[in-house]
Amino acid sequence: MTKGTSSFGKRHNKTHTLCRRCGRSSYHIQKSTCAQCGYPAAKLRSYNWSVKAKRRKTTGTGRMQHLKVVRRRFRNGFREGTQAKPKKAVASK
């Protein structure tokens, strides 16, 4: 019996299933850890040796629902509770 290519065809059990956090099929059932995001660890799995992977998952690749609003408010100096001045009527000749 070889332990290489011919043996791999006999495998039929799933080692990985869907991860609750990242949604990928990378959650190792026996280890109870995700190979992609590191779940159940509190912090996301991320390494400097994989710069491309960081680029795919970093801030700005998703909706940024909250950060978009904060950025706009920052440009206006975080002003709150003010009313827009009424537009002046254009003098017609």
Curated annotation (Swiss-Prot):
Cofactor(s) demanded: Zn(2+)
Keyword terms, alphabetized: Metal-binding, Ribonucleoprotein, Ribosomal protein, RNA-binding, rRNA-binding, Zinc, Zinc-finger
Molecular function GO terms recorded: RNA binding; rRNA binding; structural constituent of ribosome; zinc ion binding
UniProt cofactor note: Binds 1 zinc ion per subunit.
Zinc finger extent (C4-type): 19-37
Top-level lineage group: Eukaryota
Keyword Zinc recorded: yes
InterPro entries: Ribosomal_eL37, Ribosomal_eL37/eL43, Ribosomal_eL37_CS, Ribosomal_zn-bd
PANTHER family: 60S RIBOSOMAL PROTEIN L37 (PTHR10768), RIBOSOMAL PROTEIN L37 (PTHR10768:SF0)
Purpose of the protein: Binds to the 23S rRNA.
Name used for this protein in its record: Large ribosomal subunit protein eL37A
